Amino acid sequence: MARDKDVFIVLNADGTGKWTRYDSDGRMVKGESYKNGAWYYFDTATGKMAHGKYYRDGAYYYYDTATGIMQYGEQTIDGDEYYFDTETGAMVTGEVERDGRYYYYDDETGAMLGLGEQIVKYAEKFLGTPYTWGGTSPDTGFDCSGFTQYVYSNFGIDLDRTSSAQRRQGEAVDEDDIMPGDLVCYSGHVAIYVGNGQ
């Protein structure tokens, strides 16, 4: 009888199967399990060790695809970026503030939004902030270029201070090619395109 060890059980003729864990009494472990400084999860019905993105208890978690160890923080899964709470391991959605910056994840899938979509989401936080000539912060108010400079800085993009200077940065695109998060520049003014012609 297996005791206090992980055991691979072959279930199919091609050699595939499941990893399981047995405690010191020889009982199959089910649910959460802590071992050698790491958390694992075993299906409560089958005892199969969780690997990859795994849904349980109302949230998604991510377990290393080889070892089954619960992962935390930023993770790349099938080419998309996700973030798993650094304390609970649960996948986050929506707005997340970390390292002094804001990030945005899809409310349904948890995948990080594209940069343009994140810029729009962050900009929307400041709707209703008063217009102030020369303003550069949400505490004192913004003018147009102060607003765009402030929003873009959250994403590590350094814009010049005035609308005329910002117009000279970046690359011009045709109106048909404009994307959410792009700057829209016109005489004496600059704004952020949010999509749908706005």
Would you name each region that the model predicts?
Residues 37, 58, 75-81, 96-102, ...:
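Solvent-exposed, well-ordered amphipathic alpha-helical segments
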Residues 1-118:
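Extracellular adhesion/carbohydrate-binding repeat motifs centered on closely spaced tryptophans
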Residues 26, 31, 52, 73, ...:
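Glycine-centered flexibility sites
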Residues 44, 59, 65, 107, ...:
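Residue-level recognition of conserved structural "scaffold" positions that shape functional pockets
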Residues 12-13, 124, 184, 192:
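Generic structural signal for beta-strand residues in well-ordered domains
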Residues 113-145, 149-162, 186-189:
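N-terminal capping segments
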Residues 149, 157-198:
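...with weaker cross-activation on analogous glycine-rich loops/strands in unrelated enzymes
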